[in-house]
Curated annotation (Swiss-Prot):
This is Mitochondrial distribution and morphology protein 10. The gene is MDM10. It comes from Chaetomium globosum (strain ATCC 6205 / CBS 148.51 / DSM 1962 / NBRC 6347 / NRRL 1970). It is found in: Mitochondrion outer membrane. GO terms for cellular component: ERMES complex; SAM complex. Component of the ER-mitochondria encounter structure (ERMES) or MDM complex, composed of MMM1, MDM10, MDM12 and MDM34. Associates with the mitochondrial outer membrane sorting assembly machinery SAM(core) complex. Component of the ERMES/MDM complex, which serves as a molecular tether to connect the endoplasmic reticulum and mitochondria. Components of this complex are involved in the control of mitochondrial shape and protein biogenesis and may function in phospholipid exchange. MDM10 is involved in the late assembly steps of the general translocase of the mitochondrial outer membrane (TOM complex). Functions in the TOM40-specific route of the assembly of outer membrane beta-barrel proteins, including the association of TOM40 with the receptor TOM22 and small TOM proteins. The lineage of its organism: Eukaryota, Fungi, Dikarya, Ascomycota, Pezizomycotina.
Length: 430
């Protein structure tokens, strides 16, 4: 489950038109969330609130052997008025869905975490802050460890963003660490430069897109045709086939204090929202220095079913590993879901009330008259809504499962009861 502060942070990116998917670090995010999802440890309660459109708070209390907790604050210079902040109104896919479909490069004002249908929801803020100078401040204090972490995000231009993250704790070298990120996004490609005080780390990573909506014809539509008309996706004939975007990238980093470095190469193919077939994502990453090869494949088989598989191989030791993951959504409670209920089944309609017989009532017989005619049912007036016409919840929960070759498994059920969003999980990791 994504934390509330993560949800608000992505709402800030959506409101400012920043594409967080166009980075190398998010190359394999879909398979990672479907297979390597974290399991809850102990009992943990979180209370969060978007107090104002600019300010959010979160308080967490947990018990894992000892009682601990945290206090978080977030401030956004952009008013986040378009997101659902109440836990009974937040669309569950915005917090729980693992499969992430890429959105078009030409429309940066979409929510980063969206469902498979890509329909606008309450959680999708309008892109009202496509101006320079947007900023976000975040701080979190962990108790009783007295560990403090903070983050500052500053938008200088529509294509340039700087992020500073810091952690302060006594056990760390020099009492803390500082990480700086400079992100440059030109839709066709994205470049990041990073520097950290932990080991004097310096690095650079980049991602280049081609094909699909990143092609020259889609990025520069002919005169008289706007990008919204084509949805940034080119001719409709291409959508009948497997229509997606190829991305290739690499990262290179070096530790100036320990005199060690590393690098990796990666490629991804993912279908776009305009694709009319089954959504899928395939990635391949290679670490030449360590000899590791990692391949993943994820598919959204149905609106309520996502599947993923991962294969790792080392060319030096000939060791290999594999793992699979599945995500099943349900609009029923856990009991009905485990008994094999179809998530798309609808409730049976209520039986029609029996019709009254034509026989007169006793009172009408005593007064030598017919019964009064029954009032005709009034049709609702246009524009009026009944009490049952409110927003209907599409899903009530999701079951996530993973399994690997060493018989390690994980089971996680996440859902909502009234205003409480919960996670229950178990697994074997030995």
């Amino acid at each position: 489950m994504r934390e509330f502060m993560h949800y608000v942070t992505n709402a800030f990116y959506g409101a400012t038109g920043w594409n967080d998917d166009n980075t190398y670090k998010e190359l394999n995010v879909t398979a990672r969330e479907l297979i390597d999802f974290p399991l809850p440890r102990g009992l943990r309660l979180t209370l969060s609130s978007l107090a104002t459109p600019h300010f959010a708070t979160s308080y967490q209390l947990g018990s894992v052997g000892i009682v601990d907790g945290s206090i978080s604050y977030l401030h956004s210079s952009v008013p986040l008025t378009g997101i659902a902040a109440r836990s009974d109104r937040i669309p569950l896919p915005a917090l729980l869905r693992s499969y992430r479909r890429l959105h078009d490069l030409g429309s940066k004002d979409q929510q980063q975490y969206v469902g498979a249908e890509h329909a606008p929801t309450e959680s999708t803020p309008p892109a009202v802050a496509k101006v320079d100078g947007s900023s976000l401040l975040y701080g979190r204090l962990y108790l009783p460890q007295s560990l403090l972490e903070g983050m500052v995000v500053r938008r200088f231009t529509p294509a340039l963003q700087v992020q500073l993250s810091a952690v302060s704790e006594r056990s760390l070298r020099n009492g803390g660490t500082l990480l700086g990120l400079v992100q440059y996004d030109k839709r066709k490609y994205g470049v990041e430069g990073l520097a950290s005080t932990d080991g004097g780390l310096l690095g650079v990573r980049g991602l280049y897109n081609f094909g699909g909506d990143a092609s020259s014809s889609a990025m520069n539509p002919p005169s008289g045709t706007s990008a919204s008309e084509t949805n940034g996706s080119g001719p409709s004939v291409e959508k009948e086939r497997i229509y997606g975007r190829f991305s290739a990238g690499a990262e290179l980093y070096y530790g100036t204090l320990n005199k060690s470095g590393g690098m990796s190469l990666g490629a991804r193919f993912a279908t776009l929202p305009a694709h009319r077939g089954t959504p899928l994502t395939a990635t391949l990453t290679i670490n030449p220095l360590m000899g590791n090869i990692n391949a993943t494949y994820a598919v959204l088989a149905r609106e309520y079913c996502s599947l993923a598989t991962k294969m790792e191989f080392n060319v030096y030791s000939y060791e290999s590993e594999w793992a699979v993951g599945v995500e099943l959504w349900s609009n029923r409670r856990p009991a009905g879901f485990l008994l094999g209920a179809n998530p798309n089944d609808q409730a049976e309609p209520a039986p029609e009330p029996p019709r009254k017989s034509n026989e007169r009532s006793f009172q009408a017989k005593m007064e030598w008259r017919l019964d009064d005619p029954e009032p005709e049912p009034q049709s609702p007036v246009a524009g009026e809504k009944s009490a049952d016409d409110g927003p209907k919840e599409e899903y009530k929960g999701v079951l996530k499962a993973r399994f690997d070759q060493n018989f390690r498994f994980g089971l996680l059920w996440e859902g909502r009861v009234k205003s409480l969003i919960f996670s229950l999980g178990t697994g074997r990791s030995d």
